[in-house]
Amino acid sequence: MLNPIVRKFQYGQHTVTIETGMMARQATAAVMVNMDDTAVFVTVVGQKKVKAGQDFFPLTVNYQERTYAAGRIPGSFFRREGRPGEGETLVARLIDRPLRPLFPEGFLNEVRIVATVVSVNPQINPDIVAMIGASAALALSGIPFNGPIGAARVGYINDQYVLNPTSDELKNSRLDLVVSGTAGAVLMVESEADLLTEEQMLGAVVFGHDQQQVVIDNINALAAEAGKEKWDWVPEPVNQALHDRVAELAESRLGDAYRITEKQERYAQVDAIKDEVTAALLEQDETLEEAEIHEILGSLEKNVVRSRVLSGEPRIDGREKDMVRALDVRTGVLPRTHGSALFTRGETQALVTATLGTERDAQIIDELMGERTDRFLLHYNFPPYSVGETGMMGSPKRREIGHGRLAKRGVLAVMPKANEFPYTVRVVSEITESNGSSSMASVCGASLALMDAGVPIKAAVAGIAMGLVKEGDNFVVLSDILGDEDHLGDMDFKVAGSCEGISALQMDIKIEGITREIMQVALNQAKGARLHILSVMEQAITTPRDDISQFAPRIHTIKINPDKIKDVIGKGGSVIRALTEETGTTIEIEDDGTVKIAATDGEKAKHAISRIEEITAEIEVGRIYAGKVTRIVDFGAFVAIGGGKEGLVHISQIADKRVEKVADYLQVGQETSVKVLEIDRQGRVRLSIKEATAGTAVEEAPPAPQSAE
């Protein structure tokens, strides 16, 4: 009854199996992909009927990690998985981006892809496995799809490209690049790098695309053996008569509208033209569908913009193809933040802040691959007012999470190591205006805010978004694209880096036929734009501030004997808790004896350091200490001499004369000098008052007040 069909092949250093026909047989297609014990189960369901009024392609990708895959039970209150985490959202986007452009234009049937991680080898990241699974399931489904695609991760270790490096290998890699494409074209690139050159990055993209052909070949072979019959789907025929009528009414007017450089004014004019043309046509013929008219108007807009660019005319806002919009760069714009910057590029603007915290502010991330601590956080917020809209506001959406991660990748390569700068750093980018490439504005703003905060980044970084318009062999690469150029163009190509090299590269291509030559032109043109932006940023701030903000916590580091850690912490944390309350500081202790004291007030930090030094100081025999009586017993008194250490003053060591009753000479809380006579093998301390006060008479203590009966 169950007849699994399996393809098994070698993929770099790993063995991959793709199996179908065993599970989820009511789904349109389902596969289990296994790469060296990391297994992802992927299903595809496509609806045969289009919903009434549907005017966009409803593709949904869900990626979910099950903790049982790693042999664990969820730590949440209900002990089950909840909403997708940030990592799962990013992988879902990674799967979606190369697949979406491969569905034919006009295909509006709902498609849902669900990828579930069911087994995980900590050395093999499930993201590539999930991408392969989604491609295979679509190839088997019969749904109209111009795939399959492959997927590969590329590392760069010892000046060599490495295919699908393990988690341990990635720790030593200067590159983490994911590339996906069809047999003939690259469609998607996502990467972070340690300031590599344009040539090294391009080489990695080509290497990854070449290597993933084995995946595409095996998916094609599996589809030939087990694939379902192709859907009998043809696109709706173009209503040429309606197209001509719309063009007659709107084409020249849209051309004039797209010469308006100011975004909101242009949008208002375009919307007015669309409304007038739609109303006029519906008045002439009530049987026409409004959605069809809008679709034709959209294609006319696209043709107007693209034809001008290809013919060498100025762009929508009057710029040449390689020009960057006007820049305005300011730092220190907010009085109480630790670092701030306002970065404006044309009609795109980001208000970016940097906040410094201690190690306990770091984010602990519990992932399927294991727990890790993140000391650098970058959050991106895109409120609706940034584009003049009144939309919903709430928790970050997929787009905001993805843009924030891209901006973080752009800055990560220049961040200082923990031993150089022991702070947790949080950067927040508030997009206050948007007309193209707000994520790259966030990179520029983050670099400026970090320098304003006194974070010793290795170099300033900037980001730029490139676009492409291509018809046949004719192509034009555009620098610093507008939102419209992104929407109407064939490629969105974002590059971030310093003067030395690239720190992040993201590429989304909507068409096939992007050659190595085109990517080379785009990278070189992006380098020129990046260097221009960096030169303008340098006029605002050249190097990181010499000192951190007066409002930021200052972290002072001292080293103690690891054997003394227990003394500083105390029983149940009593000593360290009392210390933090007494000094108003934050104290963190590492296993090697490193103690970090954070305080906004230098005097408080000094007080905390002196108290810790007292606690951890070695008691020296023969030395005199200031002490305080803590307990009185028949045979003497216990005296605290600092650092939580206590010693016994025997009754014979209180005074030069015979002492009959200890309470006649000492009271609890009384301060007195004591001399250390001996420390025995068990660490017990023997003290003497009479030797510490030799030559000074020890007076009897005043009688304790009698309680009234």
From Swiss-Prot:
**What molecular function terms (GO) are annotated for this protein?**
3'-5'-RNA exonuclease activity; magnesium ion binding; polyribonucleotide nucleotidyltransferase activity; RNA binding
What factors induce this protein?
Answer: In response to low temperature.
GO term, biological process aspect, one: mRNA catabolic process
Lineage top rank: taxon? Bacteria
Binding locations of Mg(2+) = 486, 492
Q: Show the GO cellular component annotation of the record.
A: cytosol
Catalytic activity annotation? RNA(n+1) + phosphate = RNA(n) + a ribonucleoside 5'-diphosphate
Pfam families cross-referenced by the UniProt entry: KH_1, PNPase, RNase_PH, RNase_PH_C, S1
- Presence of keyword Oxidoreductase: no
State whether keyword Nucleotidyltransferase applies: yes
| The entry's keywords | Cytoplasm, Magnesium, Metal-binding, Nucleotidyltransferase, RNA-binding, Stress response, Transferase
State the needed cofactors, names only. Answer: Mg(2+)
Q: Chief subcellular site?
A: cytoplasm
Q: EC number(s) in its UniProt entry?
A: 2.7.7.8
Q: Where is the KH domain?
A: 553-612
In this chain the S1 motif domain maps to 622-690
**Where is the protein found, in the record's own terms?**
Cytoplasm
InterPro entries under this entry?
Answer: ExoRNase_PH_dom1, ExoRNase_PH_dom2, ExoRNase_PH_dom2_sf, KH_dom, KH_dom_type_1, KH_dom_type_1_sf, NA-bd_OB-fold, PNPase
Q: Which family does it belong to?
A: Belongs to the polyribonucleotide nucleotidyltransferase family.
PANTHER family reported for this sequence: POLYRIBONUCLEOTIDE NUCLEOTIDYLTRANSFERASE, POLYRIBONUCLEOTIDE NUCLEOTIDYLTRANSFERASE 1, MITOCHONDRIAL
Main function: Involved in mRNA degradation. Catalyzes the phosphorolysis of single-stranded polyribonucleotides processively in the 3'- to 5'-direction.
- Relate the assembly described in the record: Component of the RNA degradosome, which is a multiprotein complex involved in RNA processing and mRNA degradation.
Task: Please report the name of this protein according to its UniProt entry.
Answer: Polyribonucleotide nucleotidyltransferase
Which species is this UniProt entry from? Photorhabdus luminescens
Q: What is the lineage of its organism?
A: Bacteria, Pseudomonadati, Pseudomonadota, Gammaproteobacteria, Enterobacterales
